[in-house]
Each structure stands twice: as C-alpha cells, then as structure tokens.
C-alpha cells in the first residue's frame, strides 16, 4: 500500500462579482466553507493556472463576463494506503465528489509520496 498526493481541478461559477480578484476570493471562500462544513479541512485549495496564448506566461484560470465568473480551482489531498495511483484518484474523486455535488472533477496530478 502506497501514499499519494492527488490534485484535481474543478470549475466553480461565481455570480455578482466586480472583478477577477473578487471572483478568486469568493470562489476559494465558498469551496472552503463547503469542505470545512463536511470536515475536509485537510484539502488544499488553490487557483488553477493556464497559459496565456499571447505571451506564454502562466495566468490565473478565471474568466469574467457580465459580472459572472468561472474559476478553475485546484484541490489537493494526500491519500494514504492506496493500492495504485488509479485507486488514489478514485478515492480522492469519491471523497470530493460527495461533498462538491454537481461539480465536475478532473485529474491534474498524482504523485507517490
């Protein structure tokens, strides 16, 4: 049995925001409240990055249109005693999926620790 660090990405929609910074803060705050309410304080929350098509530099994964934003959120957690990396991903998706209902989750990274 091996331990893994699993990172998943989730889109989160935020409404009635003023700017990008507001969207980022509200998205992280809302996800944090949901996870903490279910006792999942051990999940690390961060903003995803994407590559700017013009300059090639990494930028925050957020799009704001008409005071509504979609924010790419990274969720990382350690999974202990998994049989394989695939098993660790299934455990992470199951744990987060039950808490973050109706929010799709995608694998970003799995590292053996």
UniProtKB/Swiss-Prot annotation:
Q: Fetch the InterPro entries from UniProt.
A: UPF0212
Q: Which family does it belong to?
A: Belongs to the UPF0212 family.
Q: What is this protein called?
A: UPF0212 protein Maeo_0273
